[in-house]
Amino acid sequence: MLKSSKKEDSSKKNQNNKLIFTVRKLFSPIKNFFRKTKTPDNFFGVIKRLKINSQKMTLDERNILANLLELEYKTIEDIMVPRSDIAAIKLTTNLEELSESIKLEVPHTRTLIYDGTLDNVVGFIHIKDLFKALATKQNGRLKKLIRKHIIAAPSMKLLDLLAKMRRERTHIAIVVDEYGGTDGLVTIEDLIEEIVGRIDDEHDQQLDSDNFKVINNSTIISNARVEVEVLEEIIGEKLQNDDDEFDTIGGLVLTRVSSVPAIGTRIDISENIEIEVTDATPRSLKQVKIRLKNGLNGK
């Protein structure tokens, strides 16, 4: 296992402290919003007044301010983790089995618990509660460790969700469709990232759903959930028609095949573009490699 030096640890600590200071400084004029008012219009009025005086702000502060203003238009559907990517455990699982599953499969501090199917989520378990129960040699099922979640619609505004999480004192919302089925998941961390930006681990080599990596002039590695218009802008080629019902690169691939393709499958998208599936489950695409026969912008 690689160990970071004291100098690297100190640098990372200083970066975290700087971020905390920036957020506290910027939020001081609006810290009483959730205590005194429940009206989003009032909240954005405060933010817009801050923007008028933003000349003296640092770059970090201006970026956070811009992200706050975007919350006025963003909904849960814009940021939720889709159903196919949700990691969850059955209610009938015992503590020892859950501990092993988390070690092997679920790299999160919170894990959803469902009864029967994922459409019946009963709550979630925090990993610290699990380890405490194991340390004290508690036996039995998961019910006594389950924490409550909230239910939200995909159309709910992010600021409304943030306020609801605070009122209900929970950090997880299950997104349900019109029939009551589980459509996705949003955590408090997802909301915070929308405000302060994504904070990447220095050793994390995985791509997130907001970008892709240009390897060279003819190769791009991309998360399948990256929007097609991002790829179009990079390669200078139109791939989506106005009446198409997909938004992501994964959706583009699925329009060319009858089922989710296996890892290693190559699909010709156009005369210039070939997409190879590099990561997938039986139900969804995860990551793809995009080969440009003529190079970026035909170069």
Curated annotation (Swiss-Prot):
Any Pfam family: CBS
GO cellular component assignments: plasma membrane
Name of the protein in question: Hemolysin C homolog
Note: Despite the presence of the tlyC gene, the true SFG rickettsiae are non-hemolytic.
Origin species: Rickettsia massiliae (strain Mtu5)
Keywords, in A-Z order: CBS domain, Repeat
Presence of the UniProt keyword Repeat in the record: yes
Top-level taxon: Bacteria
Keyword Repeat part of the UniProt annotation: yes
Domain CBS: 80-142, 145-202
Family annotation (CDD domains): CBS_pair_CorC_HlyC_assoc (cd04590)
Family assignment from sequence similarity: Belongs to the UPF0053 family. Hemolysin C subfamily.
One of the record's GO molecular function terms: flavin adenine dinucleotide binding
